[in-house]
Amino acid sequence: MQFEKVTYIAVPQKYGQKKVGVEEGPKFLEKLGFMNVLEQVAKSVNKKTITEPKTPQELGVTNARNLNEVESVNIELRDTIAKEYDVNNLLINIGGDHSIGLGTIAGVVKAMKPNARVGVVWFDAHPDMNTPENSPSGNIHGMPLACAVGLGPQRLTSIMPHYITPKDIMYVGIRSIDVGEQFEIQDKHIDHFTAEDVKRVGMKEVIEAINKKFVDYDVIHLSFDIDGIDPEFILGTGTPVPKGISLEDSLYFMSEMGKMKKLHSVDIVEYNPKIEEEITGKNVLKCISSLFGIKC
């Protein structure tokens, strides 16, 4: 796989959750060889960095914690992606926590024509479909997809130029599902493969379902939370959940996603090197390499 250009957006965001270190994900992946991977597949690499928010004045528990900081990052990220998005090349966003998923979807939507169909593949242990009213934690990294479909604080939902719909989403790997999220998935009939489903039917069938679902869509956006992978392989992440996707299946998933002609943007999120650096970082790089068809 070869591109004229790959745009890499570093997003050092930690305020969608409470654990320090996830903002250093881009820096540590670069240290482990991420830029070398990009240089193997692109004639040029265009790096952008989103402004890291200053420490909030108050870190008290609310039902939408650090709203100002999450809002500012997602607005800047949306506008950067809208400017850099290119259907002839690839854009990769490295977080940072998964609250950035709102800005990345918003950026793709903003870059496309108003009637374009944007499909979202959400690889994650969590659906991220909470709202401040039903979130057990108040952490906004559990809310980005809710905001993208129009549920949540107006300051966040308004970041979307227009909302995607629940039918535009395909979940892969979910297994830690809050009550409000379960209601939305069932009520809105959101397509999904739990981690248990993946083990039962095989990742090949998941890929076939993704291709079939998005056959009439204009573009696909992949948001890849590393906690979708089983903690046996991913130690350095803030909210690990047992019984996840195997590393082998994750590498196959990424290699097949990378072959999709409609995929032009990817998020890699929730790598926290302060929790564990080397094993997790190397496995994340393997996933990124597989996306580009590079054998690990």
Curated annotation (Swiss-Prot):
pH-activity profile: Optimum pH is 8.5-9.
Entry keyword set: Arginine metabolism, Hydrolase, Manganese, Metal-binding
TM annotation in the entry: none
Temperature dependence comment: Optimum temperature is 55 degrees Celsius. Active up to 70 degrees Celsius.
Residues binding Mn(2+) 1, per UniProt: 124, 126, 225, 227
Gene3D superfamilies xrefs: Ureohydrolase domain (3.40.800.10)
Pfam families assigned: Arginase (PF00491)
GO MF assignments: arginase activity; identical protein binding; manganese ion binding
Cofactor: Mn(2+)
Metabolic or biological pathway: Nitrogen metabolism; urea cycle; L-ornithine and urea from L-arginine: step 1/1
Protein name: Arginase
Source species of the chain: Entamoeba histolytica (strain ATCC 30459 / HM-1:IMSS / ABRM)
High-level lineage: Eukaryota, Amoebozoa, Evosea, Archamoebae, Mastigamoebida
